[in-house]
Amino acid sequence: MIIPPKPDDICTICYTSGTTGYPKGAMVSHGALLVTSDVMGHTGFLWQEGEVYLSYLPYAHIMETLIMAVLISGGKPFGIYSGNTAELIEDAKILKPTLMCAVPRIFQRVYEAIHANIKQLNYIKKNLVTTAINQKLSNFNQYGVLTHVIWDPLVLKPIREILGGRLRFMLVGSAPMDPEVMNFLRVALSSEIVEGYGQTENCAGMVISHSWDNICGHIGGPGYCNEIKLKDVPDLDYYSTDKDPETGAWRPRGEICVRGPALFKGYLNDEVNTKLAVDEDGWFHSGDVGMILTEHGNAIKIIDRVKNIFKLQQGEYVAPEKLENILEKCKYVEQVFVYGDSLKNYLVAVVVPREKETIEFLKTIDKDVNKDNYKDYFDDEVLKKEILKEMETLGRKNDFKGFEVIKKVHLSKIPFNAENDLATPTLKIKRPNAKKYYKKILDDLYNQ
C-alpha cells in the first residue's frame, strides 16, 4: 500500500555549498518544498501557453530542486543545457526559453555579448540601438514599462534573439546583481527580472523582489511563508536602532534571521551545527547582514557578512565577500579571492584575469601577445600593477576603507570552479579550499 507523505516528512537531503566549511546535509521536508513552490508562483513565475524553462543549475542545488518541483508538479516543459555554461547563450538560441534562472555572472556574460554585438554595428545602427535603449530605460524608470511599440520590433529584435527571442522572465540569485546590468537587460530583452535571496536551509525562497519594482540594489521582502528579523551585530556596529546619517530616517541593520514552514528540519546527523544555526526560538541565523529600506516599502538590502569576516593586525574587521562582489566589476577581473592574515595590516588577493581585456593591455607591452600565450605574462609586474591600480580606483569609488584596498596580487592561470573544488556550481568561492590550495602563494605574497 502506498502511504502518501506528510508535510513534515523528509523530501530530500540537500547539501550546503561548503563555502564556509564542509558541506552539511540539510533535511528539507515536503511541506517546506511545497510552500516555497507556491511562493514562486507569485513572483511572475506563472505559466502561460507555450512557456519553456532553460535549466542549467545542478539538480543538487536547492534552487534548481525548487524550480523542478514547480515544473514537474505542473507538468511544464523545460530544456536542459548542453553541459557547458560557456555555451549557455547558444543553448538559449536553440531552445528559445521564456523563463530563466541564473547567477549574476551568467547575466554579465549576456550583457557583454549584447555589447559586443552592438559594437560591431555601423554608426547609424549603433546610434539607433543606443537611442532605443535610453528611451526604454527612461520609460521603465518613470512608468515601469518594459516594452516599446516601435523600438522593440524595428531595432531591438536582434538583441532579444541573442537568448532566443521569447524570454519574458528572469530570476537572479546567489549574489548581488549590478543595477546597471539589470536595468539594461530588462529593457534590451523586454524581460522582467527579479532578485531572490535564500539558502539551502530555507529552501532558497526567503526573500524575493517584485517584477514591477524598478528600484535596484535590494532583494525585496519576505516570501509570505517566512518571518524575518534583524539581530544586532555589535562587533560590526550594526543595530536595529540605526538611522540614516544624512536624513535621520530609521534604517535598521543586523544579521538576517528567518523562521517559518519553509525552514529545514536540521542537518543530517549533526545536532551541534543544527543548534548553532537555529536558536531555541526557531530562528535560523543566515550569517548575512541586511538593512531595511524603510523608505522603499521595507525592502531588504544585503550589506555585509557576519560569517567569513576576519580581523587584520590593527583589529579592523574585513568582509571579503563584500569586497569581492565589487572587485569583480573591475575590467581586468573575472574572479577574485580576497585574503587577510590576522598578523598583517593589509589584504592580498588571487585574481583570475579576464582574457580579452588582459590581452588588450598586454599588447601595449608586447604586440606578439595572443590568446595562446597571454597567461605566460601573469608574473609580469607591469600587468600586476595595472590590475592593482584599476582595483584600487574601483574600490575608492565604492568607499573602500584604506585597509580594504588590495596591496598585492597573484594572477591565477586556472579559474575557480566546481571541477577543481575551488567554487560551488553557482561559482561561490569555497574559502577553506581556496585558502588551502593557494596557501604557499598567499604566504609568499606576504613575505615579498
Could you tell me what each predicted segment is?
Residues 1-15, 22, 46-52:
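Conserved pre-ATP/AMP-binding loop-to-beta segment of ANL
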Residues 262-264, 278, 298-328, 358-381, ...:
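Adenylate-forming
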Residues 34-52, 59-155, 166, 188:
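Conserved AMP-binding/adenylation subdomain of ANL enzymes
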Residues 61, 105, 167, 173-181, ...:
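Conserved A3 ("GATE") glycine/threonine-rich loop of ANL adenylate-forming enzymes
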Residues 335-337, 388-448:
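Conserved C-terminal "lid"/linker of ANL adenylate-forming enzymes
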